[in-house]
Amino acid sequence: MIKCTRRIDFDAGHRIIGHKNKCQFLHGHHYVLEITIAANKTDKLGMVIDFGLIKNLAKKWIDANFDHNLILHQDDKEIGKQIENYTGQKIYYMRNNPTAENIAIHLKNEIFPKLFIDQNFFVTSLKLYETQNCFVEV
């Protein structure tokens, strides 16, 4: 199996409903996402994937939905609607708390399979860094 990894940076805010410490409040992170894609063999050009394709598909989705935006739990729509009305931005809502773990699972299991449909490769893992020192891997 041959693996290729592409890094994508983005800035986003979130809060964790029910958290007992400061993460219960709106705050932001400079996230770094590492997408690892694998295939059993290379294509006729000798590649698993053109890194530009990852950028064009994954980064485009990240930029449109997460970058410089708020990622909130769907139960946080009251505060989200107030922010949307005030700023005009479209908040991204998730079914679960927008922890690094849940964001990575959401991207790997729900978003990226749709973006990379009908390809000869698959996403094997995602690493999502919430800080320089803390990341999750799915």
UniProtKB/Swiss-Prot annotation:
Keywords: Lyase, Metal-binding, Queuosine biosynthesis, Zinc
Active site: C23 (proton acceptor), H68 (charge relay system), E130 (charge relay system)
Pathway entry: Purine metabolism; 7-cyano-7-deazaguanine biosynthesis
Catalytic activity: 7,8-dihydroneopterin 3'-triphosphate + H2O = 6-carboxy-5,6,7,8-tetrahydropterin + triphosphate + acetaldehyde + 2 H(+)
Enzyme class: lyase
Cofactor annotation comment: Binds 1 zinc ion per subunit.
GO biological process: queuosine biosynthetic process
Cofactors (names): Zn(2+)
An example Gene Ontology molecular-function term: metal ion binding
Residue positions binding Zn(2+): H14, H27, H29
Pfam families recorded: PTPS (PF01242)
EC number: 4.1.2.50
Additional note from the record: The active site is at the interface between 2 subunits. The proton acceptor Cys is on one subunit, and the charge relay system is on the other subunit.
PANTHER family (UniProt xref): 6-PYRUVOYL TETRAHYDROBIOPTERIN SYNTHASE, PYRUVOYL TETRAHYDROBIOPTERIN SYNTHASE
Entry function: Catalyzes the conversion of 7,8-dihydroneopterin triphosphate (H2NTP) to 6-carboxy-5,6,7,8-tetrahydropterin (CPH4) and acetaldehyde.
Family that this chain belongs to: Belongs to the PTPS family. QueD subfamily.
Protein name: 6-carboxy-5,6,7,8-tetrahydropterin synthase
